[in-house]
């Protein structure tokens, strides 16, 4: 049995209009990339990339997109991304472009890179703060979001511990 090797392109959709990112849909985005590949590389590029191509992850709030394609043809996808200059969805046309952040062999390596990238962006954001009030607001927001992520896990472990204690009695 042969394993198909893939490449994952971690991209960021950059647009000045916030409505562009919020109106994202993985099917629309996948179709846009496929159409661009066909326009740039012709029938060969469209056929070569259509076999293993998929949008694996899409975050509409941050504009982060993870594209999967076959290892042999990832350069065709990568070279077609700069030719995407707009996103058309529901009759609206939004100017945008793709910024390729990372090319990896697994989803896990892309996740690790994205965590490091977000940490660097947060550090830059904190360094560019003009006063202490902005810096404290950002720190409070980040710590609040971290606490919200951890609370459900603690609640689950507490309730599981109580169930184990009841079962032992």
From Swiss-Prot:
The keyword rRNA processing applies. The modification Phosphoserine is found at residues 157, 159. One of its GO terms (biological process) is rRNA processing. SUPFAM superfamilies: Rnp2-like. It holds the Pfam family RNase_P_Rpp14. Signal peptide: none annotated. One of its GO terms (molecular function) is ribonuclease P activity. It is found in: Nucleus, Nucleolus. Keywords: Nucleus, Phosphoprotein, rRNA processing, tRNA processing. One of its GO terms (cellular component) is nucleolar ribonuclease P complex. Belongs to the eukaryotic/archaeal RNase P protein component 2 family. Component of nuclear RNase P and RNase MRP ribonucleoproteins. RNase P consists of a catalytic RNA moiety and 10 different protein chains; POP1, POP4, POP5, POP7, RPP14, RPP21, RPP25, RPP30, RPP38 and RPP40. Within the RNase P complex, POP1, POP7 and RPP25 form the 'finger' subcomplex, POP5, RPP14, RPP40 and homodimeric RPP30 form the 'palm' subcomplex, and RPP21, POP4 and RPP38 form the 'wrist' subcomplex. All subunits of the RNase P complex interact with the catalytic RNA. Several subunits of RNase P are also part of the RNase MRP complex. Component of ribonuclease P, a protein complex that generates mature tRNA molecules by cleaving their 5'-ends. Also a component of the MRP ribonuclease complex, which cleaves pre-rRNA sequences. This is Ribonuclease P/MRP protein subunit POP5. It comes from Mus musculus. The gene is Pop5.
